[in-house]
Amino acid sequence: MNSVIWDKYIHLLNEIQFEDFDFIVAIGNGGIIPAAFIQKKLNIPMKIIKINYRDPSHKPKYDDAVLLEEKDFPIKNKKILLVDDVSRTGKTLKKAKEYLNGNTIKTFTINGEGDYSFYNQEECLLMPWTSISHN
């Protein structure tokens, strides 16, 4: 498992030229920290939606991604940057796009396929924030 260190992450993020967006939507939990960094860079509002597909050991937990908070998304007709840390199967991003329909959506992932992405490799990456130990 490779490690993505903070300095490298910040460097890669600073090199991306994002188009204009109205909102950032982070997929919780994995997309929250990357989205917070992007929000700082773009200075636009951020929302969080909870979608889950995998367990903490990254094994599929459900047959399909599951929206954990069922409610109407109040934003329509906007340009949204949808952020997750990893996209392997695309199921989580697909579920989020269905939930956010009525908006123009681009995706960002640290690892995996996205409109914006640092890496697209099969091997799991250890994100800097995952090194924080639990008490």
Where are these regions (language model features)?
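Structural motif
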Residues: 23, 79-81
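Short, glycine/charge-rich flexible loops or terminal/linker lids adjacent to PRPP-binding catalytic cores
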Residues: 9-10, 44-79, 88-98
